[in-house]
C-alpha cells in the first residue's frame, strides 16, 4: 500500500485500496490527477495505446477478410454502442428503442455482457419447449423473460437489471458469449429482434444495423485510445455506423460536430437527442418527487460511473446546492459500511438529501439507519432532430423490406 500513488492507511483492506487505485487511474486518463507520478503514468499509457491501436485494427481486418467467421442467428440483430468507454448515455437509448419496438409488435430481447456481474453458483433451471431440462452448458443468465424479473443486479449487472426492471415485455439475457445468449433468446424465448447492448465491438455476431452514440460534449472522449484515453477505436471507424445518435444535446446547433462526423461517415443518418431528467425517485421507498424538489436544497451526490461530471453538473443545473461529491470507480458495488460512512458525513454537514444515478441505485445496500433520504435522478431520452431518420429506423426494423434492403444486408464496412 505504501507504493500506491496516493496515501492509503495500512489498515485499509486491499479491495478498497484497489478501488481507490482504479479511481486514480481514471483521474490520470481524464487529466484530473496531477504531479510527477501521474505524468509518468500518462507516458506509459501513451506507449501502450499504440499497441492497442494495432490490436484493434488487426482484429477488424481479420473479420473483414473473413478469416474469422461471424455467426448468423437467422433473426434481426441491432447493435447499440459507442467508440468510447462509457459516458454516452447508452442505456436510456437502449430502453427507448426496446420500448418502441415492443410497442410496434416486435418480440425484443436485449443481449448484454453483464459487465462486473457475479457468476451464478449454479445455472438457472429452464425447461425447453419439449418439457426437458435445458442443457446447463448452453444456459446464459436469464435476467428477465419479459414477464418476470429473475436476477438481482449483483448477478445480472447494473444496466441489464435496470433495463429488465423498466421494460415489461422485453427479455434480457446476459452472457459474455452473445452468440450463446442470442441462440437462447431466439430458440427458447421466441425473440425476433435482438438488441446487442454495447455491441459495436462485438464482431462474433453479425449485425444488420450498427447504431453508434456520440456524446455531444466529448465526441471522441479524451481524443486518445485506451489505455491513455477513452477511445475504444479510432474515430475513422465511425464508418461502420448505420445510424449516428448525437446524445446529450441542448437544442443549440451541432453543425460543427456534424461536419466533423461526416469526415468519417458520409452516409449514415444523424439523429440528435437529449438526455433529460424527468423526476426524482427515492431509492428504497419508490416515492417520486418533481425536479423542483431539488431547488435550493443542500445536496450530496454519490456515484460510481465513468464520467460523473455531467451527472453532478445536472444536479446543479436543477438548482441544488451541491456541497458533497463522492465518486467511486465505474460499476463500483457499494458496501453497507461505505454508504453508512457517507451518510454520517452528510448528517455532519447538514445535507437535506442525497442524489445518485439510477444505475448506481440498483447497487445501493439499505443502511441500518437512513438519516437522509436518498434519491436517484430518472433520465429519459427525447429526439430533438432527425425524427424522420428515427422513424425510418423503427419502420425498417418493424417492417423489414425485401432482402435487398441495404439496411438489412450483412455489413462488411469494417475500417480499412
Predicted regions and their residues:
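Compositional signal for N-terminal targeting/processing segments
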Residues: 46-49, 53-55, 184, 395, ...
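Walker A (P-loop) phosphate-binding motif
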Residues: 61-129, 140-147
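Aromatic/hydrophobic pocket-lining residues that form π-stacking "cages" and hydrophobic walls in ligand
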Residues: 97, 182, 342
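Residue-level detector of anion-binding/catalytic polar loops
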Residues: 107, 171, 192, 321, ...
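Phosphate/Mg2+-binding loops and adjacent switch elements
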Residues: 114-265, 270-272, 279
Amino acid at each position: 500500500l505504501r507504493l500506491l500513488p496516493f496515501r492509503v492507511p495500512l489498515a485499509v483492506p486491499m479491495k478498497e485500496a484497489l478501488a481507490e487505485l482504479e479511481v486514480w487511474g481514471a483521474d490520470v486518463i481524464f487529466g484530473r490527477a496531477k504531479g510527477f507520478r501521474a505524468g509518468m503514468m500518462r507516458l506509459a499509457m501513451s506507449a501502450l495505446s499504440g499497441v492497442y491501436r494495432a490490436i484493434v485494427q488487426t482484429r477488424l481486418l481479420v473479420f473483414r477478410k473473413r478469416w474469422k467467421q461471424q455467426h448468423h442467428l437467422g433473426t434481426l440483430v441491432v447493435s447499440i454502442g459507442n467508440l468510447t468507454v462509457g459516458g454516452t448515455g447508452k442505456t436510456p437509448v437502449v430502453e427507448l428503442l426496446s420500448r418502441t419496438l415492443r410497442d410496434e409488435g416486435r418480440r425484443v430481447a436485449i443481449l448484454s455482457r453483464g459487465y462486473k456481474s457475479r457468476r451464478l453458483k449454479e445455472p438457472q433451471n429452464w425447461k425447453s419447449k419439449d418439457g426437458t431440462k435445458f442443457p446447463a452448458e448452453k444456459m446464459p443468465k436469464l435476467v428477465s423473460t419479459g414477464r418476470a424479473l429473475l436476477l438481482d443486479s449483483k448477478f445480472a449487472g447494473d444496466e441489464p437489471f435496470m433495463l429488465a426492471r423498466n421494460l415489461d415485455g422485453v427479455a434480457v439475457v446476459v452472457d459474455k458469449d452473445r452468440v450463446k445468449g442470442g441462440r437462447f433468446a431466439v430458440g427458447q424465448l421466441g425473440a425476433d429482434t435482438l438488441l446487442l447492448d454495447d455491441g459495436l465491438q462485438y464482431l462474433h455476431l453479425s449485425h444488420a444495423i450498427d447504431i453508434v452514440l456520440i456524446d455531444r460534449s466529448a465526441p471522441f472522449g479524451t481524443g486518445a485510445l485506451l489505455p491513455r484515453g477513452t477511445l475504444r477505436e479510432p474515430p475513422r471507424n465511425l464508418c461502420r455506423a448505420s445510424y449516428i445518435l448525437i446524445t446529450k444535446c441542448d437544442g443549440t446547433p451541432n453543425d460543427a460536430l456534424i461536419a466533423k462526423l461526416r469526415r468519417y461517415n458520409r452516409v449514415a443518418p444523424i439523429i440528435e437527442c437529449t438526455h433529460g431528467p424527468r423526476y426524482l425517485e427515492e431509492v428504497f421507498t419508490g416515492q417520486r418527487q418533481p425536479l423542483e424538489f431539488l431547488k435550493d436544497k443542500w445536496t450530496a451526490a454519490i456515484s460510481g460511473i465513468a464520467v460523473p461530471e455531467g451527472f453532478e453538473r445536472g444536479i446543479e443545473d436543477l438548482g441544488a446546492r451541491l456541497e458533497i461529491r463522492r465518486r467511486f470507480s465505474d460499476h463500483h458495488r457499494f458496501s453497507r459500511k461505505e454508504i453508512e460512512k457517507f451518510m454520517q458525513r452528510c448528517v455532519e454537514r447538514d445535507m437535506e438529501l442525497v442524489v445518485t444515478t439510477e444505475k448506481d441505485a440498483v447497487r445501493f445496500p439499505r443502511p441500518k439507519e437512513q438519516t437522509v433520504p436518498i434519491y436517484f435522478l430518472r433520465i429519459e431520452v427525447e429526439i430533438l432532430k432527425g425524427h424522420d431518420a428515427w422513424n425510418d429506423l423503427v419502420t425498417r426494423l418493424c417492417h423489414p423490406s425485401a432482402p435487398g434492403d441495404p439496411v438489412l444486408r450483412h455489413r462488411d464496412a469494417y475500417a480499412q
